[in-house]
């Protein structure tokens, strides 16, 4: 039995699978089964993507053709017109983007626009889709759909043997993964999805969910996509589809315990909160290294930073590992104010980055931070700079911090904690400007946090 996949290679990006990752659903279609027409315009689509990213989505799955039961096929030109502007905008901001398509022309256009992943509901049965995946070296999701479903054909054997059906799905996914590998797709780029609701009944979907552990141990990243599906409504008694989000979170948590490392959902916030609590209570949240920047220029600066360091150490599932020296620095971005005290603290934490950011804001608030003048005087700043295995590009949840590379008051203290700060930044995709072009230059060493 293979070990659970630890990462998913998606072109130029690698998604760490130390915790369960959330794929937010972004349908730019007028006829999706639960949110059709809600995100038709580019502005509406991007606003919803931003909300999902800040709620905890690790990647966004953009779809331009509904494949709900009884769907109407969409021409490739129309599908491209729907998805490409959204993908271009998200990818330009550093968002990890998947495109939900079964058409090679759309796949190429989406990848050229910056998508990192092809999510094919037809399981890469089209040889041209396989060629596209191999040519671009992107991440792929090979999904199972019942034979004839995408052509609108009814099944003759539905419901006869649910356990046998689950075994068939597992065998199909393994076969399609091998097809992709033989075409030159990197095995670590292949994710498998059993496809609940694609021609299946509730008993079959439940049997497939019960077999999650066995399927995850095939060694490929496993995507669980139960969001608002009919089987979720059938067992929870929740209807219509939009009323199934809490029930979806229950399925997601069961799948995560069984080894699913990517979940595809509409309601990111509910599932993210449920997964955070599941991982904390089950003791399966991984400990991660993180760097936190501390700063301030009001009152007793050194005492304020020491108190913030103690508050970090008191956070749940978190401990301070090391701290830089405290530096006195010139103001950055806004002059004519007192000099700052700045430091960087290394922590080990099992908190999700969104939960950590909320905790950091709480430390600022407890210190009396008032946010009036941007970049103006403040008693305390507590910023998440970097977190191991985490990359986020939401308006509120952004990691690594986008301004690390231009801030002398961050890079110098960070250099106290890493062997080579410029090499560290290069590994993490952080561009550093030349020392003379940085802001907030160091004036002197002020003291220590110990």
Question: Which residues does each predicted region cover?
Answer:
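Extreme N-terminal starter segment of soluble prokaryotic enzymes
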Residues: 3-7, 21, 287-291
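Active-site-adjacent loop and "lid" segments of alpha/beta metabolic enzymes
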Residues: 2-3, 10, 17, 34-43, ...
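Flexible, gly/pro- and Lys/Arg-enriched active-site loops
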Residues: 332-340, 351-450
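N-terminal beta1-alpha1 ligand-phosphate binding loop
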Residues: 285-318, 324-330
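Catalytic domains of carbohydrate-active enzymes, especially glycoside hydrolases
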Residues: 47-63, 258-259
């Amino acid at each position: 039995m293979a070990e659970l996949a630890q990462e998913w290679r998606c072109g130029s990006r690698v998604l760490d699978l130390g915790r369960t990752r959330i794929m937010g659903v972004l349908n730019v279609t007028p006829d999706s089964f639960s949110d059709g027409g809600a995100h038709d315009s580019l502005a509406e689509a991007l606003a919803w993507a931003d909300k999902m990213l800040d709620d905890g989505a690790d990647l966004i799955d953009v779809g331009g053709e509904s494949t709900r039961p009884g769907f109407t096929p969409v021409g490739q030109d129309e599908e491209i017109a729907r998805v490409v502007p959204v993908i271009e905008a998200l990818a330009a901001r550093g968002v990890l983007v998947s495109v939900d398509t079964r058409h090679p022309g759309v796949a190429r256009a989406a990848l050229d626009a910056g998508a990192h992943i092809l999510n094919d509901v037809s399981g890469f049965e089209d040889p041209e889709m396989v060629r596209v995946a191999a040519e671009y070296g992107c991440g792929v999701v090979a999904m199972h759909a019942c034979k004839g479903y995408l052509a609108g054909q009814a099944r003759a054997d539905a419901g006869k043997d649910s356990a046998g059906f689950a075994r068939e799905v597992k065998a199909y996914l393994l076969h399609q993964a091998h097809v992709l590998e033989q075409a030159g797709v990197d095995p670590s780029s292949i994710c498998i999805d059993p496809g609940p609701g694609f021609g299946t009944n509730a008993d079959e979907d439940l049997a497939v969910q019960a077999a999650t552990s066995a399927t995850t141990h095939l060694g490929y990243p496993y995507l669980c996509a139960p969001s608002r599906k009919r089987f979720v409504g059938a067992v929870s008694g929740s209807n219509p589809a939009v009323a199934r989000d809490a029930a979806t979170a229950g399925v997601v948590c069961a799948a995560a315990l069984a080894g699913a490392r990517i979940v595809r959902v509409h309601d990111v916030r509910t599932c993210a909160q449920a997964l955070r609590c599941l991982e904390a209570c089950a003791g399966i949240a991984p400990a991660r290294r993180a760097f936190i920047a501390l700063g301030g220029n009001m009152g007793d600066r050194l005492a304020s930073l020491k108190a913030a360091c103690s508050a970090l150490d008191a956070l749940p599932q978190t401990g301070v590992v090391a701290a830089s020296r405290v530096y006195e620095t010139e103001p950055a971005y806004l002059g004519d104010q007192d000099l700052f005290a700045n430091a960087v603290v290394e922590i080990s934490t099992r908190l999700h980055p969104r939960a950590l950011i909320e905790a950091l804001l709480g430390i600022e608030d407890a210190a009396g931070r008032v946010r009036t003048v941007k970049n103006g005087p403040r008693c305390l700043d507590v910023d998440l700079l970097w977190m191991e295995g985490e990359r986020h590009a939401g308006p509120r949840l952004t990691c690594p911090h986008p301004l690390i590379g231009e801030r002398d008051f961050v890079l110098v203290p960070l250099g106290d904690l890493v062997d080579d700060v410029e090499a560290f930044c290069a590994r993490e995709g952080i561009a550093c400007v030349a020392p003379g072009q940085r802001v907030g230059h160091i004036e002197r060493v002020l003291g220590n946090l110990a």
